[in-house]
């Protein structure tokens, strides 16, 4: 299970809309395993395939704490069927926007349908942190980042910072 490099803001790949998975097979399950390994290594609690450069509608989530047994979830072609009117606020971060966190308001619970890693149709009622993670990762599949849910001023500052970091890391840049 190789660790994959993460796509970092401002890479335009993060703004792509991911394509539906057409077949759940061994290579797709291998990709899910690689995504989990990458997420655990980062460390993080959720990862969308687009974050490792694979524009497929697949994501992984594991909310188990470090001292708990891992409880990985694989969601293929996830779709939000219902969102609660009640809202909740969580401080969100993203492996593709390292070291930046902001409070984001989202529906407090969601009902999601998806295929599991065996290709079986499943439904999940999620609330709390799982609901927030599902919405955050499904946003990735639609080219939406959590910073799109904060004020334009804050978002512009974050994007500017990451563009500067990317420029400073560009090949051929002299360090002196």
From Swiss-Prot:
<dbReference type="InterPro" id="IPR023635">
    <property type="entry name" value="Peptide_deformylase"/>
</dbReference>
<feature type="binding site">
    <location>
        <position position="140"/>
    </location>
    <ligand>
        <name>Fe cation</name>
    </ligand>
</feature>
<feature type="binding site">
    <location>
        <position position="136"/>
    </location>
    <ligand>
        <name>Fe cation</name>
    </ligand>
</feature>
<comment type="function">
    <text>Removes the formyl group from the N-terminal Met of newly synthesized proteins. Requires at least a dipeptide for an efficient rate of reaction. N-terminal L-methionine is a prerequisite for activity but the enzyme has broad specificity at other positions.</text>
</comment>
<dbReference type="GO" id="GO:0046872">
    <property type="term" value="F:metal ion binding"/>
</dbReference>
<dbReference type="GO" id="GO:0042586">
    <property type="term" value="F:peptide deformylase activity"/>
</dbReference>
<comment type="similarity">
    <text>Belongs to the polypeptide deformylase family.</text>
</comment>
<dbReference type="Pfam" id="PF01327">
    <property type="entry name" value="Pep_deformylase"/>
</dbReference>
<keyword id="KW-0479">Metal-binding</keyword>
<protein>
    <recommendedName>
        <fullName>Peptide deformylase</fullName>
        <ecNumber>3.5.1.88</ecNumber>
    </recommendedName>
</protein>
<dbReference type="GO" id="GO:0043686">
    <property type="term" value="P:co-translational protein modification"/>
</dbReference>
<keyword id="KW-0378">Hydrolase</keyword>
<feature type="binding site">
    <location>
        <position position="94"/>
    </location>
    <ligand>
        <name>Fe cation</name>
    </ligand>
</feature>
<keyword id="KW-0648">Protein biosynthesis</keyword>
<dbReference type="InterPro" id="IPR036821">
    <property type="entry name" value="Peptide_deformylase_sf"/>
</dbReference>
<keyword id="KW-0408">Iron</keyword>
<feature type="active site">
    <location>
        <position position="137"/>
    </location>
</feature>
<dbReference type="GO" id="GO:0006412">
    <property type="term" value="P:translation"/>
</dbReference>
């Amino acid at each position: 299970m190789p660790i994959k490099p993460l796509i970092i803001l401002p890479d335009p790949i993060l703004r792509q809309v991911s394509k539906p998975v057409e077949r759940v097979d061994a290579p797709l399950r291998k990709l899910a395993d690689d995504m989990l390994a990458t997420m655990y290594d980062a460390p993080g609690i959720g990862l969308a395939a687009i974050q490792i450069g694979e524009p497929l509608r697949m994501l992984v989530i594991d909310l188990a704490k470090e001292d708990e047994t891992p409880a990985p979830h694989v969601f293929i072609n996830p779709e939000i069927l219902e969102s609660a009117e009640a809202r909740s606020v969580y401080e969100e971060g993203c492996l593709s926007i390292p070291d930046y966190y902001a409070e984001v308001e989202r529906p407090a619970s969601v009902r999601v349908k998806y295929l599991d890693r065996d290709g079986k149709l499943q439904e999940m009622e999620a609330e709390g942190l799982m609901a927030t993670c599902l919405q955050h990762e499904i946003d990735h599949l639609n080219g939406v980042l959590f910073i799109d849910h904060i004020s334009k001023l804050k978002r512009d500052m974050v994007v500017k910072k990451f563009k500067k970091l990317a420029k400073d890391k560009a090949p051929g840049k002299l360090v002196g």
